Amino acid sequence: MKFFCKLESGSSLPEYATSGASGADVRANISEPIAILPGQRALIPTGISVDIPHGYEIQVRSRSGLAVKYGVIVLQSPGTVDADYRGEIRVILANLGESTFIVEPGMRIAQLVVAKVEQVSFVETQEELTATARGTGGFGHTGEC
């Protein structure tokens, strides 16, 4: 399947690092380094716009290496790029580490994962919802079933 991309000057197509990779790496399309202080965030351009077919989305996800080595993650991960969006994909990076992180021009900053999506009809009901072992247990309750 092909997704057609429009590239700004200096940007490059997303690339899969291996034949089994789920996420395609995207790079920072910046001319100068950007410093992200500990506890801060920055919106980093990629220079990529994508013609996403109806029924698909692109999820923007953290790169595991940046997360484990530096504490740098994609905020709101996964971020969603909807099929009807045609603007530039930009990445919100957050520095959860203890040191300033420098985003260099051309650095791999995130991964794009293509996923099928389906819109459904949400219907209000006054009936009880189907019973499950988990029931109404929320955050932290999946291991208690």
Swiss-Prot record:
Q: Which NCBIfam families match?
A: dut, PRK00601.1
Instruction: Report disulfide bridges, numbered on this chain.
Output: none
Please indicate if the UniProt record lists Magnesium as a keyword: yes
Residues that hold substrate according to the record:
63-65, 76, 80-82
Question: InterPro entries per the record?
Answer: dUTPase, dUTPase-like, dUTPase-like_sf, dUTPase_trimeric
- Report if keyword Hydrolase is assigned: yes
Origin species, per record, is Chlamydia muridarum (strain MoPn / Nigg)
Q: What does this protein do?
A: This enzyme is involved in nucleotide metabolism: it produces dUMP, the immediate precursor of thymidine nucleotides and it decreases the intracellular concentration of dUTP so that uracil cannot be incorporated into DNA.
Q: Which GO terms describe its molecular function?
A: dUTP diphosphatase activity; magnesium ion binding
Q: In which pathway does it act?
A: Pyrimidine metabolism; dUMP biosynthesis; dUMP from dCTP (dUTP route): step 2/2
In short, the EC number is 3.6.1.23
Catalysed reaction(s)? dUTP + H2O = dUMP + diphosphate + H(+)
Q: Which Pfam families match?
A: dUTPase
- Protein name in the entry: Deoxyuridine 5'-triphosphate nucleotidohydrolase
The alphabetized UniProt keywords are: Hydrolase, Magnesium, Metal-binding, Nucleotide metabolism
GO BP terms: namely:
dUMP biosynthetic process; dUTP catabolic process
